[in-house]
Amino acid sequence: MKLVMVANTAWSVFNFRHSLIKELLRCGVELYVIAPEDKFSAKLTEMGCQVLDLPMQAKGVNPIADLGLMLRLLRHYREIKPDFIIHYTIKPNIYGSLAAKLAGIPSLAITTGLGYTFVNQNVVSQVAQQLYKFAFRYPQEVWFLNEDDRSVFLEHHLIEPDKAVLLHGEGVNLNHFVPSDKPQLDENVRFLLIARMLRDKGVCEFVEAARQIRQHYPNAIFQLLGDCSVLNPSVIGREEIAQWEKEGVVEYLGTTDDVRPIIAQADCLVLPSYYREGIPRTLMEGAAMAKPIITTDNVGCRDVVLDGQTGYLCEVKNAKSLALCCEQFLTLSDSEKQAMGKAGRSFIEAKFDEKWVIKQYFATLKKYEVLSVKNELFM
């Protein structure tokens, strides 16, 4: 069987679908990944994938560039002749679905979060919605990572109800992200935010909450981990972060290929995002490692937290509300914090174990008669 995955970064394919890829390759699937080249392209090749570069303008609507993207995908599909295609993220979902239809190949579209499409009600947003409505007539199914996104598409009549499938996130590897004892570094309590350094991720609210909390709790440490060099109009530059460090309100930890040691030293994972998330992977990873979560009562984010049991939900774009949640956490006893983290791990095990996500992929491929091999992991 030949299978193609298309996304806007090789990084996302490697990091978010690593276990799925391993299982597909183990079952003898000939797997192609089509995405803009980055340092993770080579890692995918090492795994056994055939990787093809796909120049793409990830943001904005440029009819000529987007037509070129669709034609490049159509050429790849006709050359590869795959049995099935899986598209991720906005432009591959739209233009890849159209190219797959023209090539006569069945496909699956997976919406990994709606980003700005339904947040900014402008001309670009309206065009994107109409493109979705046209393109999503053609995939066999469209998967949504949370019920809010699925409901929006149905309410706007952008998709037929029988094609809209709820996935509940892309899952987390529970054997890779496991609870571990926190290193006894000192008596400080560490709040950790892991994300690209974008304003939409609530980074500024995190910093303002840190200012408020540290006036009364000097043992509260606020840490930032993530890339500040991404091409995005919402990005926070290194200079601004350096000013926050100089002020003494946050520590910037840079980037890493393995977040587990940094999660292990934290007491609480925080993501005050107002971006239209799918299901934030960093929150799933933190909860899987038995860390309590503080996040916004926002699309995707709220799905990962049982408010008051596994963490706390704060108001969107409200640093004071976030600070109150942080203070509430600080007043818990050690045993209460541990119980909250343990409850979070149990919640992730019940709802976000990636093995059930992989099972759904295999069931779908068998449903459309493009995969006959048994997946022994679930037999």
What are these regions (language model features)?
Residues 52, 133-179:
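Donor nucleotide-sugar binding/catalytic pocket of nucleotide-sugar-dependent glycosyltransferases
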Residues 321, 328, 335-351, 357-363:
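A short, well-ordered alpha-helix in the C-terminal region of glycosyltransferases
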Residues 292-295, 305:
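Short hydrophobic beta-strand element within catalytic cores of glycosyltransferases
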Residues 87-93, 111:
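Short His-centered aromatic/hydrophobic patch
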